[in-house]
Amino acid sequence: MRYLWYSMYAFATALALYALFFRPPAKAPETNQPETVVIETWPEEVVEQDVDVQIALILDTSSSMDGLVEQARTQLWEMVSEMQLTADGRERTVAVSLYQYGNSRLQKGDGFIENLTPLTTDLDQVTVKLYSLRTSGGKEYAPMAIKRAVEELDWNSNDSVDKLIVIAGNEGFGQGPVSPAEAFQLAADNDIAVLPIFCANRGASQTALSSWKSAATLAGTDFESIDPDQEIAKLDSPYDAAILEKYRQLQETKVYAEGHGQSAYCQEAESYRERGVAVERAVVQSRQSHSKDLVNLYGSGRLESVPTAQLPAQLRAKSQKAQMDYLEEQNARQNELKQEIAELNAKREQHIDSRMKEIPAYRPSGRGSLGTSFKSGAKGVLKSY
């Protein structure tokens, strides 16, 4: 009997010890907190998305180049628009970097050369920097500017990406410590095409003209020359207001994580509406992929996870399914608006082409200007344009 009692005591003790030390973890209490969007990790810095075209625009900002700078301001969006579409109509994402050279306000030790923006798809940033440029006489080291752009910028090594340096100026091309041959060879070694554009204003010399023709030969391009003092006229169309309204609606569909909103330059760039670039800007921006827009990331399958606390207000209180449904709905709306803008722009371009033929005295935008030289020159040097 005593043996049975000891056996029962030992068994009870074993059960107690098991319950004490091997108890399964308690189930966490359920909460009503919404789940996080299920995708990977939101990066500390939102990286630029993949691009198809990279362009470094290098402008002479010496004292005689006010006209060149103004043409770049009014035609930047037009030039980018040209590069966004391939011959078969495929859309491409374009990144632009801006340099200035030949300005006495710049550091002599830097060769009177300054990088104003990295290669970026934030074209509003490029626009704002263009409007900040002020001309002033200085040494114009064009080959050195090309060399710096090749070495300093984050060029994509993928062969499928078109890479182009556009440099415009009016003084002798061979000035400075870097030879033209060295600059063009360095660009070629890095699979970067170079398009020299000579600014043939009243002060340009025959010696300078000859040096830019030689530069075009070294670059393997046709010689391009512009009149930097030509005033660029713009024709309105009956479709402009509708394009701007559709673009406004497109902007309303975008969703940003907390701290990752739209470009800090967006509002300032929009202030240049009165300068005649608003419609071109709307068309270009409707085609560009925006790496900070959660809707765009979702639609392209590149959306990464966003902690609930960083979600914008319209998503934070929703369940995970409701979040996905909302992004899907906005993505569909974006695609619809982009298509409508493309159709309106096709009608706009057709209308403007027709108007230009009806006005014999009208000098179309870009004839003898930076825009036209860029368009014709790019066709000659880029493999997929």
Model-found features: residue ranges?
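C-terminal "exit" segments of structured domains
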Residues: 219, 223-302, 328, 335-370
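VWA/integrin I-like adhesion module and closely mimicked acidic/polar interface patches used
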Residues: 171-218, 238
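Acidic/histidine-rich, surface-exposed loop or edge segments in extracytoplasmic proteins
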Residues: 49-63, 124-132, 304-310, 316-320
